[in-house]
A protein has these predicted regions:
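Bacterial N-terminal signal peptides that target proteins for export
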Residues: 2-15
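A cross-kingdom marker for long, charged
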Residues: 241-304
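Structured, acidic catalytic/metal-binding patches in enzyme active sites
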Residues: 30-246
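Bacterial N-terminal signal peptides
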Residues: 12-25
C-alpha cells in the first residue's frame, strides 16, 4: 500500500502525539510541575513531561521547561527525530499493518463496528480504500492523525519538534530512548481483539479530540498530574494490556537508560509524553522506587 507523502510526515512526526492520545486525558486544576530534577554525583538530570502537538497560539514553553532546556548540555527524547527516516514508519505500516489478501478490516472488526469506523473516515475526508485493508491498529493511527490535523493542533509545534529544532540551532546533542519502529511495534504486537478495542475507542474519541487536547494542555501547563492520572486510570480500565504496553513496559525499558544518565558528567534534559509520569508504573514512581529523588522544579512566577 502506498501512503501519501503528507501522511508519511504526519505518521512519523506525529506518532508520539498519537501515542499520547491513545487514551483520553481530561481535567484541570492548579497543580505542581511538569518538570523535575534529579542530582547525580556530578550532574543534574531534568525530566519533563511534554505535549506532542500544540496549536499556533499556544506553543510557547512553560517557564520551568525553558529553564531546564537552557541548563542542559544534552537532550534526550522518546525518539531522536533528526535520526529518523519518515519513510521507515510508512514502510513498517505497509509491511506489518496490512491485512492478508483474503481479509479486510471489516472482516476483522465486524460489520457494525466497521460502519462506525467508515463513517469517521468519511467525516475526515479519508477514502475508505485507505483503511479497508489495514490492521485495526494501523487504521486507528491513520484516522487519529487525520483527526489531529483537523483540530488545528500541529505535531510540528509540539514540544519534541520545537526542542529538536532549538537543539539543532544551539548545537546541543539529541539522543533517543527508542525508535519509531519500537513505538509502532507496540501496536503491531497486540491481538486483533485489543487492536479492535483501540480502534473503536479512537473512533469514539475523535469527535471530542479538540476539547480533550485543550484540557490536556491546560493540565500539562499547570503541572497537574493528579488530574491526568485520575482520568487516565479510568481510561486504563478499558484496555489494561494496551495501557501496560504503551506506558508501563516502555517506562521500565527506559528506566535503566535514564538512571545511567545520573552517572555522567553532563547535564541532561529528558523529555517524554506527560502521561509517562503518572501512576504506579510512571517514571516518577519507578525512579523513586529505585531510591532516586525527583524534585519538582517550581515556577519562577505564578501561572497566568
Amino acid at each position: 500500500m502506498i501512503f501519501p507523502q503528507a501522511m508519511s510526515r504526519g505518521l512519523a512526526r506525529g506518532l508520539a502525539g498519537v501515542l499520547l492520545l491513545a487514551f483520553g486525558a481530561h481535567g484541570y486544576a492548579r497543580g505542581e510541575s511538569s518538570v523535575w530534577s534529579m542530582k547525580g554525583e556530578r550532574n543534574t538530570v531534568y525530566l519533563a513531561g511534554s505535549v506532542h502537538a500544540l496549536p499556533k497560539d499556544h506553543a510557547e514553553f512553560p517557564e520551568q521547561l525553558e529553564r531546564a532546556y537552557k541548563a542542559a548540555n544534552i537532550i534526550v527524547l522518546e525518539v531522536d527525530l533528526d535520526d529518523m527516516n519518515p519513510l521507515d514508519a510508512v514502510k513498517f505500516i505497509s509491511t506489518n499493518g496490512t491485512l492478508p489478501a483474503d481479509k479486510s478490516l471489516k472482516d476483522v472488526v465486524g460489520a457494525e463496528p466497521y460502519q462506525r469506523v467508515a463513517a469517521l473516515a468519511a467525516s475526515l475526508d479519508v477514502p475508505e480504500t485507505v483503511i479497508a485493508k489495514l490492521e485495526p491498529w494501523a487504521a486507528a493511527l491513520v484516522l487519529t492523525q487525520f483527526a489531529l490535523n483537523k483540530t488545528g493542533f500541529d505535531a510540528n509545534l509540539g514540544i519534541d519538534m520545537q526542542i529538536t529544532e532549538r537543539a539543532r540551532t544551539d548545537g546541543k546533542p539529541v539522543e533517543g530512548l527508542e525508535t519509531v519502529i519500537d513505538q509502532l511495534s507496540v501496536f503491531d504486537n497486540r491481538s486483533f481483539e485489543e487492536q479492535t478495542r483501540f480502534l473503536l475507542d479512537s473512533a469514539d474519541d475523535a469527535p471530542k479530540l479538540t476539547e480533550d487536547l485543550q484540557k490536556l494542555i491546560a493540565a500539562w501547563r499547570a503541572g497537574n498530574l493528579r488530574a491526568l492520572e485520575k482520568e487516565f486510570l479510568k481510561e486504563r480500565k478499558k484496555s489494561p494490556e494496551l495501557y501496560d504496553a504503551l506506558l508501563g513496559v516502555r517506562n521500565r525499558q527506559w528506566l535503566p537508560k535514564i538512571e545511567a544518565l545520573l552517572k555522567g558528567d553532563q547535564d541532561y534534559l529528558v523529555v517524554v509524553g506527560a502521561l509517562h509520569f503518572v501512576g504506579r508504573d510512571g517514571l516518577l514512581s519507578l525512579l523513586r522506587r529505585d531510591g532516586h529523588k525527583a524534585v519538582a522544579v517550581p515556577a519562577a512566577k505564578p501561572p497566568r
